[in-house]
Amino acid sequence: MEGYILDWANLLLRWLHVIVAIAWIGSSFYFVWLDNSLTKPTAPDLKDKGVDGELWAVHGGGFYNPQKYLLAPKQLPDHLHWFYWESYSTWMSGFALLTVVYLFNANVYMIDRSVFDMTATTAVLLALGFLVVGWLVYDTICRVFGKNDRVVGILVAIYVVIAAFAACHLFSGRAAFLLIGAMIATIMSANVFFWIIPGQRKVVASLKAGEKPDPIHGKRGKQRSVHNTYFTLPVLFAMLSNHYSMTYAAKYNWAVLVLIMLAGVLIRQFFILKHKGVVNWGYPAAGVAVLLGVAVWLAPVSRPAAPVAEAPAATAPAAAAEGSASAPAAAGQATAAAAGGSDFAKVQAVVTARCYQCHSAHPTLMPSPAKGVLLDTPEELGKHAQLVYQQVVQQKLMPLGNVTQITDDERTIIAKWFEGGAKTN
């Protein structure tokens, strides 16, 4: 029942997170477009009111004329709409989802002992540290070098590269990618919470008090808002990357992450300039070139299957990480015993020894079968043959962190079975 409840929490939080993220990104992209599309007003009355830019647009059968004031209107309207709950709700739902999926299952999803051996508690603390330290470093860079946008951009980019390298050498690949995305998303939402909204509140307070607002608040808010728009596409990739293991499972996965994020920034730059009337196809061309280069770099190389050892070396799997049950002690004997049987019998022995801990009706490493995938019957194993082959043989992602210590010989057993037609009889 606990696993069932967590699955529903995962579903509902993920749904909520996507909905509010669409609202936040949509409003952010709209205002970046609006800011860069404004034209100087020609009507004297608009100039007298302090309007610095305006735009005429048509949408949904109606005409719109948004106007932006150089600093603020002389008199505030009775109702003033604020844009901040989109940001806050996106971060809160995202952190809740991170907690339910990753922090509650650190042994399974965050730790890869072939990368860095640590306890679940250490993994959780390090993950939280990435979020906090990421914001503190970024904010310090902006405070110290804020008057020079180029220097800020270079230093922030360098920090993201360092953070990506560190994360990929501490956590499992999928967790590392997600944490870098969460770190940048935390920076984005913290920009709204600590700088953009407080600055706007100070401007409003000054106007209500009959004082002239300090323009520095608008400048700081605009700078952080611009940073956020460049962060958006890299964060979206990091959040989607968990579905594409060829990226986070690569040998130099940190470089893959950095390069794809760079492609996102280049593509975003094209649209930002286009809003200003400047069309430079070099930016998207460079972004696409980077993506194609990464795709070619990561392309799998077809090799003939190696001959299967007559009696594969199979040792009893090590105990799973802290707080989880150990794999069956007789796993090695079961695998070796199947060495002389049919291809499918050998595969069943390997799956029983190495995969049942997460993919059976009664898993021992988690409350319910991971991703709802069961491998404890011939029918289920045959149905998921393609997935097993991809995850275990081609990408070597499973078992997660190789917690059950599957051997290369055992992976070859699965490869030979699948490439021979994945027969279950």
Residue ranges and their predicted role:
Residues 2-6, 65-83, 214-218:
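Cytosolic juxtamembrane amphipathic/interface segments immediately preceding
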Residues 15-44, 183-199:
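Hydrophobic alpha-helical membrane-embedded segments
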Residues 28-72:
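Membrane-interface amphipathic/juxtamembrane segments adjacent to transmembrane helices
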Residues 61, 75, 95, 102, ...:
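Aromatic- and Gly/Pro-enriched helix-to-coil junctions and flexible linker segments
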Residues 87-106, 165-178, 231-250:
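Alpha-helical transmembrane segments and their membrane-interface junctions
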Residues 103-217:
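Long, contiguous internal "core" modules enriched in hydrophobic/ aromatic residues
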Residues 133-139, 195, 262-272, 294-299:
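Alpha-helical transmembrane segments
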Residues 147-154, 249-253, 274-289:
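Membrane-interfacial entry segments at the cytosolic side of transmembrane helices
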